[in-house]
Amino acid sequence: MRLLLASASETRLALLRAAGLELDALPARIDEEGVRAALEAEGASPLDVADTLAEMKAQKLAERHREALVLGCDQVLAFRREVWGKAPSPEALRAQLLRLRGETHKLISALVLYEEGRPVWRHAGEVRLTMRECSDGWIDGYIARNWETVRHSVGGYHLEGEGVRLFSAVEGDYFTVLGLPLLPLLNYLGQRGFIPT
């Protein structure tokens, strides 16, 4: 069965291909900010926000590709009682990083698989990240050096790049930080016979 990733994320695609999966990636265009805002207004948890967005992406692509196994993914940042997506500008990222420094936040990464137009599997992983006390100047320099590469990342950092220097502690699965809880996904695909085990 053909595997489709309902995402434009180069990181997710690279992780899946590095794991030996053959797949194609097609972005599923949904109004993420509008959906996130509506869910927050209803009091949805960060996990529910990530799961709903992942499902909407998978569903949208599955409607056009019923023959494929479609993987929808989403990641949100949870800080106190707020749910954050991607910062829309360097200024917004600066404000986020200033609020996060010295604090602990969570990244929640959700996956939903659709088969024959219906959801068949879902998983959400959570990681706790504690940001160190960074100076305003270091944060400004970090954003100036990295904006173009982190602008599409929740939190505005890549743990696999200079963004790792923002943190004093990370508790949880590395793949979940990257937006793809890979091991549970591979386990499911193996159990179902989609990949050899």
From Swiss-Prot:
The enzyme's E.C. designation: 3.6.1.9
Catalytic activity: a ribonucleoside 5'-triphosphate + H2O = a ribonucleoside 5'-phosphate + diphosphate + H(+); a 2'-deoxyribonucleoside 5'-triphosphate + H2O = a 2'-deoxyribonucleoside 5'-phosphate + diphosphate + H(+)
Record's keyword terms, sorted: Cytoplasm, Hydrolase, Nucleotide metabolism
Catalytic residues (positions): D74
Keyword Secreted among UniProt keywords: no
Cystine pairings recorded for this chain: none
Location of the protein in the cell: Cytoplasm
Any Gene Ontology biological process: nucleotide metabolic process
Keyword Cytoplasm: yes
Cofactors (names): a divalent metal cation
GO cellular component: cytoplasm
GO molecular function: nucleoside triphosphate diphosphatase activity
Function: Nucleoside triphosphate pyrophosphatase. May have a dual role in cell division arrest and in preventing the incorporation of modified nucleotides into cellular nucleic acids.
Family the UniProt entry places it in: Belongs to the Maf family.
Protein name: Nucleoside triphosphate pyrophosphatase
Organism, scientific name: Cereibacter sphaeroides (strain ATCC 17023 / DSM 158 / JCM 6121 / CCUG 31486 / LMG 2827 / NBRC 12203 / NCIMB 8253 / ATH 2.4.1.) (Rhodobacter sphaeroides)
